[in-house]
């Protein structure tokens, strides 16, 4: 899980979602997991 000020999609499979008011990126590749913070 990467914590970044700005999250963006890295590949085609990445999905930007909102969970509990936080913007997150979920993907089939675990390296692409990000959270805004």
Curated annotation (Swiss-Prot):
Keywords, in A-Z order: Ribonucleoprotein, Ribosomal protein
Single GO BP term: translation
GO molecular function: structural constituent of ribosome
Recorded GO CC terms: cytoplasm; ribonucleoprotein complex; ribosome
InterPro entries per record: Ribosomal_bL36, Ribosomal_bL36_sp
Keyword Ribosomal protein: yes
Pfam family, one: Ribosomal_L36
Lipid biosynthesis among keywords: no
Top-level taxon of the source organism: Bacteria
HAMAP family: Ribosomal_bL36
Name this protein carries in UniProt: Large ribosomal subunit protein bL36
UniProt source species: Thermosynechococcus vestitus (strain NIES-2133 / IAM M-273 / BP-1)
């Amino acid at each position: 899980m990467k914590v970044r000020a700005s999250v963006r999609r890295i590949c085609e499979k990445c999905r930007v979602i909102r969970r509990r008011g936080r913007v997150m990126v979920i993907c089939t590749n675990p390296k692409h997991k990000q959270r805004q913070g």
